[in-house]
Curated annotation (Swiss-Prot):
It comes from Drosophila melanogaster. One of its GO terms (biological process) is sexual reproduction. The keyword NAD does not apply. Responsible for physiological and behavioral changes in mated female flies. Disulfide bonds: none annotated. Residues 1-16 form the signal peptide. This is Accessory gland protein Acp63F.
Length: 81
């Protein structure tokens, strides 16, 4: 019984750590996450949406726009978190 309670508490604490639980799909559909001062290439929009959410949780701005294709050179790479 104690093991079940510990397991439930563990799962609850892991879930409470992040609100960014969107599924990341495995399809290859390159997109670029755009911010005024940086860009980030991602394998697909779901990946970039999750990175954007995690950035917001860490007090950084989320992506303004996601555009199809790879990012253009000229801006630095955005940090993941």
């Amino acid at each position: 019984m104690k093991a079940i309670i510990v397991f439930i508490l563990f799962i609850s604490s892991v879930h409470a750590m992040s609100k960014c639980n969107q599924a990341i799909y495995l399809n290859l559909d390159p997109h670029c996450g755009i911010l005024p001062d940086c860009n980030l290439d991602g394998p697909n929009p779901s990946y970039l949406k999750r990175v954007s959410c995690e950035r917001k949780e860490n007090g950084k701005p989320g992506f303004i726009e996601l555009i199809p294709g790879k990012c253009l050179h000229g801006k630095p790479r955005c940090s993941l978190k």
